[in-house]
Amino acid sequence: MAATQHLLDVDGLSWPELQRRLAVAEQMRAIRLSQAGRVNDLRDQSVAMLFYEASTRTRLSFVEAAHALGAHLIDFDVSSSSVGKGESLADTVRTLGALGATTIVLRHDRAGAPWLAAQAFGGHVLNAGDGWHAHPTQALLDLAVLIRHIAASDGSLAGRRIAILGDLQI
């Protein structure tokens, strides 16, 4: 496996790193919209969906992305697991690692849960929202939409004031 990388928050990402991630996302989007539609970049990887909170768009987007990238999907149902008997997040992610998960997509109602998961898990952790604290994948999506639609005229968001109310339409 490549060096472990997590996406826990966008606060620590530099502008060049944000641009790099957005460029990769745009490449994947173009492939997805093309005739090919799929790549197998993650064909030897297992992605575990670990959602402690209900989610429609975020969860389904990650499921579809995992399939489109060729990953094996581990769809973990928190409601029918030992979490209900008190199993800790750390124990749950260690179990997923023992079962072969290389990446965990975590949605949790507790701020900081993704950092705890990253400490306990030997693979990649993607924060799909941790309460009211952070939702870096949503932030990246919002930024990508802004760049694609608003800044397309001059290629820059510099000097613009932008307010986001509710969900962006994508």
Segments and roles (model prediction):
Residues 1-64:
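Positively charged, low-complexity intrinsically disordered leader regions
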